[in-house]
Amino acid sequence: MTNFTFDGAHSSLEFQIKHLMVSKVKGSFDQFDVAVEGDINDFSTLKATATIIPSSINTKNEARDNHLKSGDFFGTDEFDKITFVTKSITESKVVGDLTIKGITNEETFDVEFNGVSKNPMDGSQVTGIIVTGIINREKYGINFNQTLETGGVMLGKDVKFEASAEFSISE
């Protein structure tokens, strides 16, 4: 069994969404945690739970962030966390239940496992994974949008994300 200690200082969770049909808006969730159990040498034994604090959303625009926290989007007064609980993990895919605003759907995302390395600063063993995917926000009741004069919509339905998580590990 491997002991995993999440290193939030060396991890990130970023997203982007199409805006006004012509550009992308990017942001991040600044508070999240990932708990992992299992043997790093046998991916079939790994189980992980990611917990994201939606009120930590950061798009570098306070007014937009406040709107994203409202009931039009994440409803952070009522829904204080987003969770992803794995069902299976391989070196290239992860399948699990994603819950946003109390709505749960099974999702499959891509995984990039970057092996194990020794940290020269303290001698600890570290590992990292990068998880990428696309989430249809409308499946989670995040339906806010406005029609544009050109016939398009203000916001795309698909949200692309990249989560990079680093862990100290020990046996």
Curated annotation (Swiss-Prot):
Residue ranges crossing the lipid bilayer per the database entry: none
Pfam families linked: YceI
SMART domains named in the record: YceI
Protein family (similarity comment): Belongs to the UPF0312 family.
Name used for this protein in its record: UPF0312 protein SAR2769
